[in-house]
Amino acid sequence: MSRPAQKRAFGVAAGLPEEVCGPLAAAVQDAGYDSIWANDHPFAKGLETLAEFAGAADDIDLGVAVIALDRQGADVIAEDIKRLDLDPARLWIGVGAGFSKKPLTFMTERISELREKLPGVRLVMAAMGPKMCALAGSSY
């Protein structure tokens, strides 16, 4: 039985200086990585970092993990993707409940909203615990 080729991802910290992103993205792509991922932080948006990588590495996917949906809703994420001219077909967006009071209810509502507002974007859900894992599994 043959196994599918292993995918390789490269992770960076959001907020890297612009002059670092282009050369690093090209090197990551040339090294055979399939995607570049950035974290998201209140003081450095992962999508903005990925936009710096997008032009220099046009053959690999771009991912951000994890955007706390209690800080940024689907409208803000969609606006950022449009403003930054990111191709939805290249994007992976990791999302989590953040510090919401009822995380299961919160994520149940937000996932359908995200799917509606972010067509073509691949979503992954941060899930800790059996109930959130079950929700993540039923959402995909």
What do the PLM-derived regions correspond to, one by one?
Residues 37, 61-65, 92-94:
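Short, conserved beta-strand segments within well-ordered enzyme catalytic domains
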Residues 13-17, 41, 67-69, 96-100, ...:
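Active-site beta-loop-alpha junctions enriched in small/polar residues
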Residues 60-76:
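Short hydrophobic interaction/assembly module
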Residues 1-61, 121:
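N-terminal beta1-alpha1-beta2 module of alpha/beta enzyme domains
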Residues 2-8, 73-140:
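Internal, glycine-rich beta/alpha segment that forms the wall or movable "lid"
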Residues 45-50, 69, 76-80:
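Alpha-helical scaffolding within the catalytic cores
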